[in-house]
Amino acid sequence: MTLNLAANGTQWYSGERTWTSADAILYALGVGAGAEDPLSELEFTTENTRAVPQQVLPTFAVVVGGKGGGPELGDFDLARLLHAEQSITVHGALPPTATVRSRGRLAGFYDKGADALIVMEGETTDAETGRLLAESRTSLFVRGEGGFGGPRGESEPWRVPDRPADHLVTYQTREDQALLYRLSGDRNPLHSDPWLAARAGFDRPILHGLCTYGFTGRALLHAACGSDPTRFHSMRARFTAPVLPGQALDVHIWDEGDAYLFRTTAGDRIVLDRGVFLTKAT
């Protein structure tokens, strides 16, 4: 079993897709908007509320890119492939409806000793105007595929500030949260099929990592941006543990002046870590 190292640097066109107002609303519901107070986030959960124009959660950027078109990553058991890190940069508020084009690039294979890290980058542009809407960087961890002699890659410094969080936001996920979130495009049966979840070592289907990421993005939007999507610039975090639907998520946010640091916990486990969030000046 080997990595397809020859694919390093490959670029591809992921295709064109259109999203609708309903798609943006469905995503918002999938990451908990309005669940605890149906009147609190109407700008994200409705399109026809009087004097409340529809807006789009910035983390919708993780699902709007095209599907497919990338190179084969290698000949290895996909059960050993894990979503390690995710970052997004949003260039202005996402529109409620749009037709977009997406491109991707395999940015690197990194040798982590016994394991490997694959990094892919993407960008999404408005198909009509060509305006850059969002950029993404996705890191995939492949267990047992290290030792190929490649670069290790740099690790950016990060530490928990030596003080209580400046903001603590708690969201309760629903028992059916994964069933809602999968309607935004990620139909991986690990999040819905009890048989497959058991085969992967879980008592029941787990929540999508990007759903946890979306809940965390909502917390950052409200705590650090005054609920204004135009102030949301970039978000980066590492996935460290799975979440079960129905668990509560605690988002710990520290204001460091030039950036916000964050981590998300579920009970006594850290599920998102090494988070860095940047805002735009108003």
Which role fits each region the language model picked out?
Residues 26, 43, 58-59, 87, ...:
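Generic structural signal for residues positioned in beta-strands
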Residues 36-37, 126-131, 225-228:
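Short, glycine- and charge-enriched coil/turn segments that flank and shape catalytic ligand pockets
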Residues 2-45, 156-212, 219-222:
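A contiguous, surface-exposed recognition patch within enzymatic or periplasmic domains that forms
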Residues 195-270:
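Catalytic-pocket segment enriched in acidic/His residues
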Residues 20, 62-68, 139-145, 173-184:
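Phosphate-binding glycine-rich loops and adjacent basic patches that engage nucleotide phosphates
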Residues 1-99:
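Hydrophobic, proline/glycine-rich low-complexity stretches
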Residues 42, 55-58, 79-80, 92, ...:
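Flexible, active-site-adjacent loop/turn segments at secondary-structure boundaries
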